[in-house]
């Protein structure tokens, strides 16, 4: 029970932190590279995990990650991160850009805008990600 809780909490924390930051970059920056990266994330979601299991196992053996908690956490987070990014990106797209512009006019940088304006509004989707990934 203890190992499962540690793995679940660490995996969900990684997915929430990196997912919301990556999604903010995807949602607010419009470029060809961002649309390619979004398509790449969606493409990763379509690959069945069992199809790359042999390659992942080979790399874990080379890295000494067999029977290690960190290996399970990294693999679980890597497989779950595209879905978290997708959920966060769609939610951030519904937040008006005018809020970011108003924060910029008030002198807030990108990190301050994300931390003070966008992140508090991400509570509903964060709860959804925690429920979907933590169960």
Where is each model-derived feature located?
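A structural signal for multi-pass alpha-helical bundles of membrane permease subunits
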Residues: 1-135
